[in-house]
């Protein structure tokens, strides 16, 4: 055997070894690419590049009334949102906080993400968690008559609303913010101050998400005297712009009721709003604009209205706000006295 043939044999051996190394390397590369794809899955983009935020649930758009009183609050909200500050709307139940927050959020022409706070909400509910499993199956037939099989099962991270909003530059509407326990909301501190969201439970570089420059937040809360309200920690409140709201003026409430209740006479609308505003002053329970809307809806079903029917409707609307059955009798007495004492009440 010549030296050249030996060299060819050696060269052939090297080629076969190199080919196996290349196959193994390609297999590793495919696996690494697939793992990278999974790491990047939380960007939540569809194939055509549109955001999956478009598919997120947000409350159905409701009629919104623009009066001078409403516009003044809107202007104040936009002032702070324009400079990147989160806005915290605080006020009694039924004064229109949520409707205002959703309207201003939609007007920004950015995606809107909705969170509804409650005592059971956790940090994971806000940011996400490893909530799914994904299996990767690989079949390598590169070498003739040789099949390599490999299955990889790994946890898959699923983003929740806050993370989606931060990534996409959406407007976050966090309704009933103060009903969530303060410890769950700690994650907001770095979002509002450092512009970084930390994902507890994530690993490696994926643990931190830079806040999109278009991200904004609007939070709503009932006043602290309401049951079930947790007082947020001072460090977080220090980073929020607080706007305290009360019930709108009579003219605005009339327009709101008219917008929500079709086929209801204008004069009747004015009278039911007047009645509810009077009850608001006399009763210990909260009588919001929503109560006036509900009462007007009930009145649209009545052909021959009398004082007894009007009393029934008002008591039905407000009875869920009293603590026990015995309080309903006192409520009815107050409603009857108020109706009797008002001139020009619906008749």
Swiss-Prot record:
In what ranges is there compositional bias, type Basic and acidic residues? 18-42
Q: Where in the cell is it found?
A: Gas vesicle; Cytoplasm
Keyword annotations for this protein, in alphabetical order, are: ATP-binding, Cytoplasm, Gas vesicle, Hydrolase, Nucleotide-binding
Primary location class: other
Q: What is its EC number?
A: 3.6.4.-
One GO process term, biological-process aspect: gas vesicle organization
GO molecular function annotation: ATP binding; ATP hydrolysis activity
Q: Does the keyword ATP-binding apply?
A: yes
- GO cellular component terms listed in the entry, alphabetical order: cytoplasm; gas vesicle
Q: Give the induction annotation.
A: Expressed from a single promoter upstream of gvpA; most transcripts stop at the gvpA terminator, with low read-through into downstream gvpC-gvpN-gvpO. Expression starts in early stationary phase and is maximal in stationary phase. Highly expressed in 25% salt, poorly expressed in 15% salt, no gas vesicles are formed at 15% salt.
Which residues take part in binding ATP? 91-98
Q: Which InterPro entries match?
A: AAA+_ATPase (IPR003593), ATPase_dyneun-rel_AAA (IPR011704), CbbQ/NirQ/NorQ/GpvN (IPR050764), Gas-vesicle_GvpN (IPR013462), P-loop_NTPase (IPR027417)
- Substrates-to-products reaction catalysed: ATP + H2O = ADP + phosphate + H(+)
What are the start and end residues of every segment in region (Disordered)?
1-50
Mention any additional remark: Encoded in a 14-gene locus called mc-vac.
Give the family this protein belongs to, as stated in its UniProt record: Belongs to the CbbQ/NirQ/NorQ/GpvN family.
Q: What does this protein do?
A: An ATPase that functions in gas vesicle formation. A minor component of the gas vesicle, also found in soluble extracts. Gas vesicles are hollow, gas filled proteinaceous nanostructures found in some microorganisms. They allow positioning of halobacteria at the optimal depth for growth in the poorly aerated, shallow brine pools of their habitat.
Q: Under which name does UniProt file this protein?
A: Gas vesicle ATPase GvpN
* Source organism per UniProt: Haloferax mediterranei (strain ATCC 33500 / DSM 1411 / JCM 8866 / NBRC 14739 / NCIMB 2177 / R-4)
Tell me the name of the encoding gene.
gvpN
């Amino acid at each position: 055997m010549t030296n050249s043939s030996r060299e060819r044999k050696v060269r052939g051996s090297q080629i076969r070894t190199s080919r196996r190394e290349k196959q193994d390397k390609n297999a590793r590369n495919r696996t690494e690419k697939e793992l990278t794809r999974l790491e990047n899955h939380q960007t939540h983009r569809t194939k055509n590049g549109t955001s999956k935020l478009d598919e997120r649930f947000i409350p159905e758009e409701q009629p919104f009334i623009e009066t001078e009183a409403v516009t003044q609050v809107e202007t104040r909200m936009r002032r702070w949102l324009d400079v990147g500050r989160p806005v915290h709307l605080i006020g009694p139940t039924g004064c229109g906080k949520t409707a205002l927050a959703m309207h201003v959020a939609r007007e920004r022409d950015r995606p809107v993400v909705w969170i509804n706070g409650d005592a059971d909400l956790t940090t994971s509910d806000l940011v996400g968690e490893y909530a799914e499993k994904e299996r990767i199956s690989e079949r390598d037939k590169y070498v003739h008559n040789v099949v390599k099989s490999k299955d990889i099962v790994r946890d898959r991270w699923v983003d929740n609303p806050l993370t989606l909003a931060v990534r996409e530059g959406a407007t976050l509407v966090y309704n009933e913010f103060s009903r969530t326990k303060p410890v769950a909301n700690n994650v907001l501190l770095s979002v509002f101050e450092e512009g970084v969201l930390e994902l507890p439970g994530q690993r490696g570089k994926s643990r931190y998400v830079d806040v999109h420059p278009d991200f904004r937040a609007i939070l709503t809360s009932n006043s602290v005297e309401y049951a079930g309200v947790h007082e947020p920690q001072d460090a977080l409140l220090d980073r929020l712009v607080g706007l305290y709201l009360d019930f709108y003026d009579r003219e605005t409430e009339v327009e709101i009721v008219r917008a929500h209740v079709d086929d209801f006479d204008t004069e009747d609308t004015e009278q039911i709003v007047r009645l509810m505003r009077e009850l608001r002053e006399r009763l210990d329970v909260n009588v919001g604009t929503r109560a006036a809307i509900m009462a007007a809806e009930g009145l649209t079903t009545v052909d021959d209205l009398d004082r007894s029917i009007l009393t029934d409707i008002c008591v039905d609307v407000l009875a869920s706000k009293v603590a026990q059955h015995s309080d309903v009798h006192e409520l009815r007495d107050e409603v009857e006295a108020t109706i009797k004492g008002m001139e020009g009440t619906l008749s």
